[in-house]
Curated annotation (Swiss-Prot):
Disulfide bonds: none annotated. GO terms for molecular function: GMP reductase activity; metal ion binding. It comes from Salmonella paratyphi B (strain ATCC BAA-1250 / SPB7). Coiled coil: none annotated. Homotetramer. GO terms for cellular component: cytosol; GMP reductase complex. One of its GO terms (biological process) is purine nucleotide metabolic process. Catalyzes the irreversible NADPH-dependent deamination of GMP to IMP. It functions in the conversion of nucleobase, nucleoside and nucleotide derivatives of G to A nucleotides, and in maintaining the intracellular balance of A and G nucleotides. This is GMP reductase. It comes from the Bacteria.
Amino acid sequence: MRIEEDLKLGFKDVLIRPKRSTLKSRSDVELERQFTFKHSGQTWSGVPIIAANMDTVGTFEMAQALAGFDILTAVHKHYTVEEWAAFINTASADVLKHVMVSTGTSDADFEKTVQILALDPALNFVCIDVANGYSEHFVQFVAKAREAWPTKTICAGNVVTGEMCEELILSGADIVKVGIGPGSVCTTRVKTGVGYPQLSAVIECADAAHGLGGMIVSDGGCTMPGDVAKAFGGGADFVMLGGMLAGHEESGGSVVEENGEKFMLFYGMSSESAMNRHVGGVAKYRAAEGKTVKLPLRGPVGNTARDILGGLRSACTYVGASRLKELTKRTTFIRVQEQENRIFNSL
């Protein structure tokens, strides 16, 4: 047993210090980035935000809507090959450019992903997702995926420490997914006592990944556009959003009605709701590590996407970053004990 004395921080613990700026307008800020990935050699340009691979977020409908904003969608792994084929037949090449194919690490997952990727060469992203990216089996699966798909861009996670980021990048991952427990419907931290404050995880993992020519995506912990800006400021190359994109027309959750008001169900992918839906219930040897919430219907996701991108542009103007790429270089975090004036929050 050992105790690390260093203070670890989440998004709520900091604000970004404003700096002099020569920008005249938020419209002067360029949010699009261009990346060439370490292993695949592929080049991609777009806004580096990803809709999470949850079945109440990462839907085909979400991918269609967010592609119009140049945003990626990690489509959840529970669609069948036939459903993928139907989607590809109606989707444009521009939409497919903004799609990640998600998979688990079982043999069945691998075989299904092989079939999906064979449907269209425009599917260039694979998202290998497990709750705990620290297992030897997971590292071996990433290496297997790299061997099978040498020209596909592979995103793999989740982990929260630099040495594991390095391990995954050396095993074939182009992008490492960072985050254990920060999600809005994740209960891993309270069920297991395991986790890592998200901002510190991003800063440390970005440092490790960039040293090897890899990249990271900050997955979880964002509750507002300012948190997205903080994740990019901390060094994240991409930011993945779940709860912020849930509850919309494109989100895919079941709609329930209470007292004349309609709500959409949103749940974590390790929740009892998810396991009942996809694997026939919670196995006797495990506990559910997610919760189910009812969200008021939020309308089309486009309005939320515009709000997030507008907040991100504004953050860049406050620190003088004319491009999103410059935000991390111009970010100075200050530790705080309050984020906002809450006097009217209950109204």
